[in-house]
A protein has these predicted regions:
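Hydrophobic packing and interface segments
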Residues: 28-32, 38-51, 60, 64-782
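Intrinsically disordered, low-complexity regulatory segments in eukaryotic proteins
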Residues: 14-22
Length: 782
């Protein structure tokens, strides 16, 4: 594999070979496609160097074979009946590299402006300042300890990559292995930086949002949204920066899989760890506060209340940001891997991927800058901004497709279909989770008959809610496939990858909406703890309700985007596996036959992994929450005056934060390692065919479970809030107690297991692609 990679990216300028790392080939003939001037005589040996992409070179080599007769798996080429053609547009690709870095700089500058704007807003309430500081310190403590654990994992993983990837170090080129390991570390580092800064801005924004709510919804919305937008801009900017830099420096899209694996491994642990933390605190606070003691949700007497607010940030800001960073990088990486394997216009397709990503970031910047609350309230403002961003993106990409030579309207159609289906999935998710829609009201009414009916109805509607999203993913993949299939071999799967790029093109706006949720959720609690009055709390409640609705929509969107991404990653896996198979002189993979025992073996194992992964995370929440509930009981029983709320008596908040932190870090590692180990074991047993089946089973099972759990949890959450607003007897009623039970069940569904599954799917897909050459060389039944 490494030998073949050493000849994939060869710099030829004016017929002169740049001699860096060399590979000598026997090529029957080689001539310039444009001028017809021979570059090497028929039947001669020709030396190509590696180290840079093919730029400004177009050449023709009949049959494209080595002297040994092995097929050359050029990533920029395709073997036609008449020969092997490679075509490159140097100036166009260079333009989009430059525009990528320029747009990233604009995004970072705008994020810095928003950060400074939020920081300038006044905060004067001493109690709010005190609690905000506790939340900030708790979040920083968790992030520091989590990143320390992840750093150790990253170092071990980087060493493994250095030794084995893209091919065992003793069989290949050490430079490629070093590049892959560095790219992996860069992926983890950029994701971690984006998450850390996002937490900083979120904890800065919450208190200011609470105090601004005294003046009304509009100023509070603007602070909360702009605080979240900093995270959105950083995530997309860092992902585009990393992808462009890695491809520019190495010229090898396969190295991007290492960068993407770094992002996805951090996302897996950040989302799972943050989810366990936040739901440990949330479940414990609800059970002891609302159910046992009957005290309000954000009552400062509850020892878990600060941990609950910390969890909102580490789970929904850092965790979801890392999740969508991973999805965005994986979508671009898979599209670029496939683009470089296409014939004739490979670099036009590479340019198209970058162009669409740039315009998506630009459209998100416009959408963020123009977001305002109108007469219809904050939910409408968030949705309107998303729709505006979508329209701007579609218009800009259509103009670019018309202007740039080599851009295809079929590929634009695939990207447009992906984005539009993503928006539609968001709308259907909203229907099942919004407390103004009939489904939530039906579950609330069922709660009047007891908690069993709350749980049963929520599970039922949760499964039904998966239907439109699954069908939407299937339809978008099918349309993208059929749109691009006439363009030639390999373009159909490229169309699916561009549908994923299209769906994630406005991810800057999506993350901004999602990060807004925990900021206003914290603000609502701070308004109550700071004694800002009922009118301010009502304004904060309205902002929080919009945040809950949008968070549910965002989760549906991110899961659906991951679905399309992993389908395209399956195509990238086939491309990488075929390179290794060609190098070994073995039959290439054209598909996966379900009747094959090795494929079916992979399907069954792959299908059960998401279920086991989910169970491990939910059990982690269960065990951790039991420890925290015991700690809360201890404090209420041992700290005199705490239960009565006597002045000057405070709970030991740090004890609950420590339980949530240590427990989440202890529970997240086994679940993540289980997924990776299962992939490796299946690969060594059945080879590439078994891995293909494994990925198919994992994708279908994982998407279904993720959508079900995310939507059912969001439904139960908003059912509880709907009753708390006065429906079905209001707070303290039997309906409310039943709804709290439903919400307690749904919390780890929607914020721990559900959104972590899509990251798990991405991780195993990337592990499969990265280890494809190893599985070809070392497997029992392939």
């Amino acid at each position: 594999m490494a030998f073949f990679q050493s000849i994939l990216y060869s710099g030829i300028s004016g017929g002169v070979c740049h001699r860096e790392r060399k590979a000598t080939l026997f090529i029957p003939s080689l001539r310039c496609e444009k001028s017809g001037v021979p570059l090497a005589g028929r039947g001669s040996l020709f030396t190509l160097a590696s180290g840079s992409p093919l730029l400004g070179a177009a050449f023709f080599a009949p049959q494209g074979r080595l002297g040994s007769g092995l097929h050359l798996p050029f990533k920029h080429s395709k073997v036609f009946e008449k020969g092997l053609v490679i075509s490159v547009n140097e100036s166009q690709l260079g333009l989009f590299y430059g525009l990528s870095f320029l747009c990233v700089a604009i995004a970072f500058a705008f994020a810095a402006y928003l950060y400074l704007w939020v920081k300038k807003q006044k905060t004067e309430n001493a109690k709010i300042q005190e609690v905000s500081l506790l939340i900030k310190q708790g979040a920083n403590t968790f992030m520091r300890r989590e990143y320390l654990v992840l750093a150790k994992f990253a170092v071990v993983a980087a060493v493994v990559i250095l030794v084995l990837l893209p091919s065992p170090i003793w069989t290949g080129n050490i430079v490629d292995n070093i590049s892959m390991a560095i790219a992996y570390l860069c992926g983890t580092a950029l994701s971690a930086i984006a998450g850390k800064i996002g937490i900083l801005v979120a904890t800065l924004s919450n208190g200011r949002t609470a105090e601004a709510a005294q003046k009304g919804i509009k100023p509070a919305f603007l602070i909360g949204f702009r605080g979240g937008a900093v995270m959105g801009l950083l995530v997309v900017g860092c992902s585009l920066l990393g992808v462009a830099a890695v491809l520019l420096v190495t010229g090898d899209s396969s190295i991007l899989l290492g960068f993407s694996f770094g992002a996805s491994s951090l996302a897996l642990f950040a989302k799972a760890g943050g989810g366990i933390f936040t739901k440990t605190a949330d479940v414990s606070a609800d059970l002891t506060g609302k159910v046992e003691l009957g005290i309000p949700e954000d009552d400062p007497r509850n020892p878990a209340v600060i941990a609950d607010n910390v969890g909102d940030n580490v789970g929904d800001v850092a965790g979801m940001g890392a999740d969508l960073f991973d999805s965005n990088v994986a979508a671009m990486a898979s599209a670029l891997v496939i683009a470089q394997s296409l014939s004739g216009t490979g670099f036009n397709n590479v340019s198209m991927v970058f162009c669409y990503a740039i315009l998506g970031l630009f459209a998100s910047i416009i959408g963020i800058a123009t977001a305002r609350v109108g007469k219809k309230g904050p939910t409408s403002a968030l949705n309107s901004s998303t729709y505006v961003t979508t329209v701007i993106y579609l218009v800009l990409t259509a103009i670019a497709t018309a202007l740039f030579p080599g851009f295809s309207w079929r590929i634009w159609g695939a990207a447009a279909v992906g984005l539009l289906v993503g928006v539609i999935i968001g709308i259907t998710t909203d229907y099942f989770t919004d407390d103004s829609k009939p489904i939530v009201k039906k579950v609330a009414h069922a709660s009047s008959s007891g908690p069993a009916f709350t749980v049963l109805s929520g599970i039922s509607y949760g499964f039904i809610s998966a239907l439109p999203a699954m069908v939407g993913i299937a339809v978008s993949a099918l349309i993208a496939y059929k749109l691009c299939e006439p363009m030639g071999e390999g373009y159909a799967i490229f169309g699916i990858s561009m549908a994923a790029v299209g769906m994630l093109s406005i991810v800057g706006m999506i993350i901004s909406n999602d990060a807004y949720g925990p900021i206003v959720d914290n603000a609502r609690g701070l308004a109550e703890m700071g004694g800002l009055g009922e009118e301010t709390i009502r304004a904060a409640d309205e902002l929080d309700s919009a945040g809950n609705t949008v968070k549910a929509v965002t989760k549906g969107f991110s899961i659906s985007a991951a679905g399309l991404t992993v389908i395209s990653l399956l195509g990238a896996f086939m491309s990488e596996a075929n390179d290794a198979l060609a190098a070994a002189g073995r039959e290439l993979i054209t598909g996966f036959d379900i009747m094959s025992p090795t494929v079916f073996f992979g399907v069954l194992v792959g299908a059960v992994v998401p279920a086991v992964f989910s169970a491990m995370l939910i059990l982690g929440v269960d065990k951790n929450a039991q420890r925290m509930v015991a700690e809360i009981h201890r404090q209420f029983n041992s700290i005199k005056g705490l239960r009565e709320g006597k002045p000057g008596v405070k709970p030991e908040y740090d004890k609950c934060i420590d339980i949530a932190t240590s427990g989440s870090l202890r529970e997240l590692i086994p679940a993540g390692l289980m997924s990776i180990i299962a992939t490796v074991v299946v690969g060594f047993i059945g080879g590439p065919s078994a891995i293909g089946g494994f990925l198919l089973g994992n994708i279908v099972s994982g998407l279904l479970l993720a959508l079900f759990m995310s939507n059912a949890g969001g439904l139960w959450d908003n059912c509880k809030k709907y009753i708390e607003a006065g429906a079905e007897g209001g707070k303290g009623s039997d309906s409310h107690k039943a709804a709290v039970i439903g919400d307690t069940v749904g919390d780890p569904f929607k914020d721990t297991a559900g959104p972590s599954i899509n990251t798990q799917i991405t991780v195993v897909s990337l592990v499969s692609s990265l280890l494809s050459s190893v599985f070809v060389m070392f497997s029992f039944f392939s």
